[in-house]
Amino acid sequence: MEAVKTFNSELYSLNDYKPPISKAKMTQITKAAIKAIKFYKHVVQSVEKFIQKCKPEYKVPGLYVIDSIVRQSRHQVGQEKDVCAPRFSNNIISTFQNLYRCPGDDKSKIVRVLNLWQKNNVFKSEIIQPLLDMAAGIPPPVVTPVLASTTVAMSNTPGTPVTPVTPANVVQGLPDPWVSQITNTDTLAAVAQILQSPQGQQLQQLIQTLQIQQQKPQPSILQALDAGLVVQLQALTAQLTAAAAAANTLTPLDQGVSFNKKLMDRFDFGEDSEHSEESKKEIPTPQLSHVSESVNNSIFHQIAEQLQQQNLEQLRQQLLEQQQPQKVTPQDSQEGAFGSEHSASPSQGSSQQHFLEPEANLDDSIDIQQQDMDIDEGQDVVEEEIFEPEAKKVAVRSRSRTHSRSRSRSPRKRRSRSRSGSRKRKHRKRSRSRSRERKRKSSRSYSSERRAREREKERQKKGLPPVRSKTLSVCSTTLWVGQVDKKATQQDLTNLFEEFGQIESINMIPPRGCAYVCMVHRQDSFRALQKLSSGSYKIGSKVIKIAWALNKGVKTEYKQFWDVDLGVTYIPWEKVKVDDLDGFAEGGMIDQETVNAEWETVKTSEPVKETVQTTQSPAAVEKETVVTTQSEVFPPPVTMLQIPVAPTVPAVSLVPPAFPVSMPVPPPGFSPIPPPPFLRASFNPSQPPPGFMPPPVPPPVVPPPAIPPVVPTSLVQPPLSMTPETVKDVGFGSLVLPGGSVAGNLAPSTLPAGNVFNPPSKAEPEEKVPHLTEHQIPSGENTRPVIPSDIPSSAPMLAQPPGASNTSGILCVQRPNVSSNSEILGVRPANVSNSAAIMGAQPPNMLNNSGILGIQPPNVSSGSGLLGVLPPNLPNNSGLVGLQPPNVTNPAGLLGTQPPIGPQNLPPLTIPAQRMPALPMLDIRPGLIAQAPGPRFPLLQPGIPPQRGIPPPSVLDAALHPPPRGPFPPGDLFSQPERPFLAPGRPNIDSVPNPDKRIPLGNDNIQQEGDRDYRFPPIETREGINRPPPVDVRDVVGRPIDPREGPGRPPLDGRDHFGRPPVDMRETLVRPGLDHLGRRDHFGFPPEKPWGPRDFDEREHRVLPVFGGPKGLHEERGRFRAGNYRFDPRSGPWNRGFGQEVHRDFDDRRRPWERQRDRDDRDFDFCREINGNRLGRDRIQNTWVPPPHARVFDYFEGATSQRKGENVPQVNGGNTERHAPPPPLPVQKDPELYEKLASSGDADKEESGTAAGVESEAVVESTETEGT
């Protein structure tokens, strides 16, 4: 007995340990038990008592003690001689009743032990099965059956797999092939075995009672056959089937797997086919099926037929009352082994509605009406189920009663896919029509259900989570990896994850020992999660953990919808903001099946509108296609700029040029990929430099009448025949001149010939006609008077006197040889390819929409339309404002040019080189064409309140409005510095009061400065600060000098040498190039040789822009001066409103340089040592203040105002001293002065090279201004 005491003390010491109990402790207890094996009865009793009295959490350790003792005993003495197992089995029922008082979580452990016992034949299956049933809530037969059924039902709620994995349940899930393999002998043996068991005998007795009751025709049968009997039948049947199943070699684990899979299958989670394949592999023994087969075919068939012939109406009501509170009928857990319970499953319609999806409501009424038939026909129903097995599975979703049946169908049903049941159907009494209807339903739903399952399976393979109705699924592709070794590198993670697929990013957080791995595809991340979470994978020395991580794109407000198990954020549709949709995909993906179709339409509506515009005018599209060779289109963000032009909005776009995203190709002026906002578009070797345009190609000829009325660049408000909707559809990229020239887009490509005309009533156009006749303008085509009635209502532009109230009116003379749909409005000289029309402005007092005069001075080489400021009181004016109509007396309303006074003002039409193409820019590559000023700026007059769609003042500064006729490079689009909106511009440039100084119209030899300035800002100014271009760009741009200097072309001097003879210029051109090669001082400009009149000047000017920027670039730039210099002066001024010059004017950085003038009194020699000799120069300038004035005016007779504007100091100190008082430059022509300068400044020049030229030019301009 000492051993027993020792054992007891060991056993009860379990209470001192906190579960789970260690293996060592269990070993000690087992050893003590084996030592006391002689007193095995005491040992067994002690264990049973311990289990009975211990706390719930020690129940399972008590079971483990039983297991350990029994197995050790069997191991030592052999199975036959073992005494412990039989002793434990004597009282095992009560022991397990005590065990099942354990916490709910531990029940699965008890079941696992039972399954192991069953597998290893520790106890007989007859012993184990009731214990398993107890786990399932079915008490052993001694307990009252009714209670049993209730507990079963309560514990076995649908939708959640039953906790215990009992063979009774496993039997339900047998696949057909096994059933078909069963031999008759097996079946008979199984039936015999069942019938011999005590439960089998009870079942036989029950059947006999039923038969006896059935033979007596008394109505009291119903009392005898009460619910308890039926439930007892069920319980017995379940036990029997399970017992028979337990006899075979099915492993408990496999049972669990197959049961779970089959259960899932019954609930139709879409995984069934995969799982059934797995379960077929996992459970190789076909013998289970014979049990259910035999049970169904023999015993229950008889019972079913007997019960079917009785009137069970009252019984059904009884059962309904009993089972109403239960969510599921007891049969749900046992029906697999019990075929007749259809007679006893009356609550199908009502008790399982929680299964139903919304469509179930529709069927409830049918269920209620048909329940009588369902019950009365008992077995019929089963037979029909057999006949239409698969279809019923689908119907499960929509019909509650079919659902319960589909779960309860036994393997017999599955076997009979061959429709073998059709034979039996003939013998049944039932409503034929109902069965036919059911068959139709099932056949219809079968294919759709199969498709749904396949789709679901596909989704699972892709790692996609289940779809929820009216919910957006944002599936994460980001995985959280935890417990990462702190020494692990990104490469370690890459090596681990790249086998699963492409990795988008890895974000490691070493202090926390975790990382976020974002995969490109959801499927890859899903596979990685599956594999890495199942095994113990190490990175470094640590085993990693892995889980789904919320993807970056899901904002905080949506985090509440995150499901970490599925790795998906389920966002209800009503909570989704369409703007956030694109962001959701960051670090994840949007499940397209869950996207609301309405969002797509919302998102695509804007671009669709734009397409309307392009498709509406075939001619316009045709031209665009010819014009542009680029296939890239601007990215969608451009769409945000698009403002539909409603009739109340001025037709000239108030935003920087853009074009509809829907256009097949970008308009000519845009570079294929937009350059950064302030950088010049990079050079494209396949494209000619800006000044060299290919020969004009006439636009395609389209007969006028057939052309739709859409005017792509709505210069004029569309006439009334265009509905506002169509106007809205015109993308406002079309309202603006995207390219460098007016040509392609300024005028409507669809303009019919009849609409472009010169009404004889206007005096000025008639004056113009003589000039035009030089160019063979057929009077019939251009000058025929058109009376409004004879103009088609769709005509986009009509001429009319500016004061008229008509809504249309563009005065223009069409170029004779341009086809009738010519894009050019205005006077188009025949030989000037680049002169695009200048759109006239409406007089300020005009209340009416359009009425644009196109009067172009043909010699304006830049040729783009002048942008003016719309008169403040024009409520709804469309059209670019350019030259003011001759009879408009109030010039102040136009920020533009002086009104032409007649033919004498129109300069000769011969411009040797093409500045800008006048035709649709057919061969011009997008990046190199300067952009027309018009489209760039809102037509705002200073003082007009900003309109709604206007971008911030930094883009639209009124003061920066360029002087007339300058195309600008695309790069300058947004280069304006931030300034107060509509702040006054540079003096003398934007103010209309001195128009005469602005455009010397009649002068043949004088190159119009506005053109030069806008077209080609000097490369220093244009590129030095904002956009340092690669050398080759500069090189190519600079090299082609000769064509630009073509005969008869006005000399393109630097800004300052406006009126100088061309020869001088050319001299200078050659010099600077040498200088920057390092040879300039010694070779190009030998010190002994006196400076040429402008040499000193140019050098200074040139260096200045260089001053503040990176030296390498500037020095290089200087090297190519020789070829380049012609362009520089031209391109520089062209920047007048943009680029560096803008910065010079308005940038704060300029002030320090201006202040240097205050330091002039410093020693002059000190200046030489400074790069660029700034201080030295300042001093010289101050010294020589008086002499320059006369010179300045000599040089720039009419252009002082323009001079000043052009040479606004540039950013970073380039030309900062522009306003410095007197520049020495003009002095150059004075020999004395010049010698002095040369002598004093020689050292400086030697050091600074070209710098001298640049700066002195700047000086001249400032002098000019002060003189003015």
UniProtKB/Swiss-Prot annotation:
| InterPro entries recorded | CID_dom, ENTH_VHS, Nucleotide-bd_a/b_plait_sf, RBD_domain_sf, RRM_dom, SCAF8_RRM, SR-CTD_assoc_factor
State its role.
Answer: Anti-terminator protein required to prevent early mRNA termination during transcription. Together with SCAF4, acts by suppressing the use of early, alternative poly(A) sites, thereby preventing the accumulation of non-functional truncated proteins. Mechanistically, associates with the phosphorylated C-terminal heptapeptide repeat domain (CTD) of the largest RNA polymerase II subunit (POLR2A), and subsequently binds nascent RNA upstream of early polyadenylation sites to prevent premature mRNA transcript cleavage and polyadenylation.
Record's compositionally biased regions (Pro residues):
961-970
Q: Which residues form the RRM domain?
A: 477-551
Give TM segment ranges: none
Please state the gene responsible for encoding this protein. Answer: Scaf8
Spans annotated as Disordered: 322-355, 385-469, 753-808, 947-1063, 1199-1268
- Give start-end positions of Basic residues composition bias: 394-443
Sequence ranges of Low complexity compositional bias = 1249-1262
Please give the SUPFAM superfamilies that the UniProt record associates with this protein.
ENTH/VHS domain, RNA-binding domain, RBD
Ranges of biased composition (kind: Basic and acidic residues): 447-461, 763-774, 1009-1025, 1032-1063
Q: How does it assemble?
A: Interacts with POLR2A; via C-terminal heptapeptide repeat domain (CTD) phosphorylated at 'Ser-2' and 'Ser-5'. Identified in a complex with CDC5L and other spliceosomal proteins.
For this entry, the protein name equals SR-related and CTD-associated factor 8
